[in-house]
C-alpha cells in the first residue's frame, strides 16, 4: 500500500502559509486562491468537484467537495477547514489538516481502495472567528445540506491541527489536572476527540487508527461542546444527529503558536504527520458498515 509522503504535504502547507494577504474571511482573493489550488492538485486524481456556496456578511464563501465512490449509498465525510484566524500563516491551524486531507485523498486513489462506503472529502471555509459557533460556518452549511437531503451518513471525521509534536518531557498541556493521570506528558501522540453520545463510531475510528500505528493514538471523549470535544467542524454534525469526531494534536494545549504569527511551517513535524495519515488510511479499510 502506498504511504503518505511528507514532501507532498510540506509543499501543500508551503503554498497555504505563503499566501498574502492571509487566508482569513476578509481576504476573499486568498480564499479563492486556496480553492483553485485544491482543484488543481486534486484534479490530477479525479474530476467532479462541487462548490457549495453561501453568503455571510454580504460576501460569498465556498466549500469544495469531492465524492469518492459516488455510487455508494452509505457515505463517510472527511473534512478540514482552510481559513485562518486573523493575520497569521496558520501552518498547524489549519494548513496541516488541509495537507493531510489532500494526502488522504491522494492515497485513496493511488491505492484504489475498494470500500463498502463512499467518502465525501470536504474543504470548509469559515471555521474561524467571527463565524465559529454560528450557522455561517462552512461545516454547518454542509451538515445541514446532507441532513436536508436525508443522505445516509455513517459519520464524519474532522482533521484539525495534526502537525505539531514534541519529544520534550512536559510539553503536553491539559485542560484539567485530572487528565494528567490518563495521558502522556510528552506531546508526541495524536488524539481522536469525540463525545460519548457517539461512542460506537468513535471507538471504531480510534481502534482502526491505533492498530499497527507508528504513532501513538489516544482517545478523548467529553460531553457536547465541552473542552476540546467541540472545538472544530465536527460540532456541527452533532446538531443533525450525525456521529463525528476530530483528529487533533490537542491544539493550544500543546502548540504555543496557536493563532499567532509564529504558527509557521518550520514548527511542523511532517514525518509524524505522515504517520497520522498512514494510520487513518489503514483505518478506512477497517470501517464496518451495516
Feature names for model-found ranges:
Residues 1-3, 20-29, 52-54, 85-94, ...:
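Second-shell loop/turn segments in exported
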Residues 3, 167-290:
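Active-site-adjacent substrate-binding region
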Residues 8-11, 15, 29, 33, ...:
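Extracytoplasmic/secreted proteins, especially bacterial periplasmic and envelope-associated proteins
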Residues 8-71, 218-220:
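A non-catalytic alpha/beta surface segment that caps or lines the substrate-entry region
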Residues 12-23, 123-124, 183-188, 259-261:
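Acidic/histidine-rich, surface-exposed loop or edge segments in extracytoplasmic proteins
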Residues 55-57, 70-72, 82-86, 126-130, ...:
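Solvent-exposed loop/turn segments at secondary-structure junctions
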Residues 65, 76-79, 120-123, 154-159, ...:
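Structural recognition of the beta-strand scaffold that forms the well-ordered cores
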Residues 85-203, 226-229:
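Acidic/histidine-rich catalytic neighborhood of metal-dependent amide-processing enzymes
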Amino acid at each position: 500500500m502506498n504511504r503518505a509522503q511528507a514532501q507532498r504535504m510540506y509543499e501543500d502547507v508551503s503554498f497555504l502559509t505563503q499566501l498574502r494577504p492571509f487566508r482569513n474571511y476578509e481576504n476573499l482573493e486568498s480564499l479563492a486562491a486556496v480553492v483553485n489550488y485544491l482543484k488543481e492538485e486534486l484534479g490530477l486524481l479525479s474530476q467532479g468537484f462541487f462548490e457549495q456556496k453561501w453568503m455571510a456578511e454580504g460576501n460569498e464563501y465556498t466549500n469544495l467537495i469531492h465524492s469518492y465512490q459516488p455510487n455508494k449509498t452509505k457515505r463517510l465525510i472527511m473534512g478540514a477547514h482552510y481559513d485562518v484566524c486573523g493575520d497569521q500563516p496558520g501552518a498547524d491551524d489549519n494548513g496541516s489538516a488541509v495537507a493531510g486531507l489532500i494526502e488522504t485523498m491522494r492515497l485513496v486513489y493511488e491505492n484504489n481502495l475498494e470500500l463498502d462506503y463512499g467518502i465525501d472529502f470536504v474543504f470548509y471555509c469559515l471555521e474561524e472567528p467571527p463565524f465559529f459557533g454560528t450557522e455561517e460556518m462552512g461545516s454547518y452549511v454542509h451538515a445541514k445540506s446532507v441532513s436536508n437531503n436525508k443522505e445516509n451518513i455513517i459519520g464524519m471525521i474532522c482533521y484539525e491541527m495534526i502537525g505539531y509534536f514534541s519529544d520534550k518531557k512536559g510539553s503536553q498541556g491539559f485542560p484539567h489536572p485530572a487528565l494528567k493521570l490518563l495521558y502522556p506528558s510528552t506531546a508526541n501522540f495524536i488524539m481522536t476527540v469525540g463525545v460519548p453520545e457517539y461512542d460506537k463510531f468513535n471507538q471504531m475510528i480510534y481502534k482502526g487508527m491505533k492498530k499497527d500505528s507508528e504513532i501513538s493514538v489516544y482517545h478523548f471523549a467529553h460531553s457536547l461542546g465541552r473542552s476540546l470535544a467541540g472545538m472544530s467542524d465536527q460540532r456541527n454534525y452533532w446538531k443533525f444527529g450525525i456521529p463525528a469526531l476530530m483528529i487533533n494534536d490537542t491544539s493550544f494545549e500543546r502548540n504555543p503558536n496557536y493563532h499567532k504569527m509564529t504558527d509557521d511551517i518550520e514548527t511542523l513535524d511532517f514525518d509524524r504527520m505522515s504517520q497520522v495519515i498512514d494510520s487513518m488510511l489503514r483505518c478506512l479499510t477497517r470501517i464496518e458498515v451495516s
